[in-house]
């Protein structure tokens, strides 16, 4: 199911209310587990993970990082809503790629007893939002989780997995650390994210420079995501799509916000710089092709939401093929008989 939400990024409101959180559960300090910049041998090395760590650290060190948290807080709240929908308690939870703790701030200690938060950016962990849930922050890579098998009742992840080089391995790691009958609830950017910006940059660069380079990072297709979750061992899968449209004053304000979110491109094949006239042309193309009636420009963020369970004997299972005792033909005849009886 596709839902679209439209938000407005109004720069007059940059100094909005700061996020507050209780201090009932004092968080632990970051552990000595270092983030890994390497990838597994089978992975394509698409992203510069060290650059992504620097980008996220830079964003977390800004004087008011909450100015750029609007999208991540929105998705964090939606993941928390899905956790509450499960209607059970989770004594031990894990947030992978937590950033400043965008999911935990929307959870409560009645539902989650204790949470471990991991990220590759140490400054994001140091500046994470405090909640009343006992919290331990650990510096760790999404592809190399430092936890034993069958540890967590719940694993969550919000807008982080689209930057890993080996998504299959990351999902396998999540499945590995979950307890039997544990659940993974996550969200990541989808393939149509920022299509307006991608198209505008490509058209302008082709016109001005005779070709174009990728300036928007590649994203996973929704059909592939369900397959990868199943291959990692998850069952009872749910994958759905949201679109969030945010309106900005212009293209340069959009790019400034992406930098403030720590979401700038970190692909190895990225072009370091674009010429000034190419950027101005891209901004003009963006406004010409996509602008709203009020002069603002929209940016679309496609979100893939996913839920997957680790197998347990208590879970419902599909019946074996050929075990049915009633055919569809029998049901059709029964329906006809009941219809005639009503007449």
UniProtKB/Swiss-Prot annotation:
Residues 1-29 form a transit peptide. Residues 18-40 are annotated as: Disordered. It holds the Pfam family Methyltransf_11. Its EC number is 1.-.-.-, 2.1.1.-. It is found in: Mitochondrion inner membrane. It comes from the Eukaryota. InterPro entries: Malonyl-ACP_OMT, Methyltransf_11, SAM-dependent_MTases_sf. One of its GO terms (molecular function) is S-adenosylmethionine-dependent methyltransferase activity. One of its GO terms (cellular component) is mitochondrion. Interacts with NDUFAF8, leading to stabilize NDUFAF5. Interacts with NDUFS7. Interacts with PYURF (via TRM112 domain); the interaction is direct and stabilizes NDUFAF5 protein. Arginine hydroxylase that mediates hydroxylation of 'Arg-111' of NDUFS7 and is involved in the assembly of mitochondrial NADH:ubiquinone oxidoreductase complex (complex I, MT-ND1) at early stages. May also have methyltransferase activity. PANTHER family: ARGININE-HYDROXYLASE NDUFAF5, MITOCHONDRIAL. This is Arginine-hydroxylase NDUFAF5, mitochondrial. The gene is Ndufaf5.
